[in-house]
Amino acid sequence: MKKRFLNGIGYGIDGYCCEEGDRQRAAGNKKINYTNIAINGLLFKYKPTNAEIEVDGQHYSYKKVWLAPSMNGRYYGGGMIATPAQDRLSKDRLLSLLLFHGSGKIVTLAIFPSIFKGKHIDHPKNVEVKTGHRIKVTFDRPVALQIDGETVLNVKTYTAYKE
């Protein structure tokens, strides 16, 4: 399956939030609160995955990945500054990959709100940003993916690149 995106591909808790929002909407809930979905997901429902990452041929392994969006822009999800240094208009045509990993629920909940000011990157033990022309992310189990806010279910791997 090949899909194009303008801003970002989200894999992890953001994909879960889009999936749960779609489920609630289908059940007739017209007022979807993504903040509540995220908190409830982080505390009770979403389980982090392990990931194999490839950025321009360099390989990395991560445990307990909560969030791994590949971004063309820097903002997504209602004002989160996922990749503060990302410039979608730069001549180098790089994408950025945010990796939020390695923490338990409480630490994740403590750090997560700082994403709205782009300050989550001040936690290098749990948050990394990698840049490259081609990014491949493979998780140890299928989960929901969001592409510019639209949900795609049961995805285990994705590759992002600029044409």
Predicted features, each with a name:
Residues M1-E163:
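Long C-terminal subdomains/extensions of small-metabolite kinases
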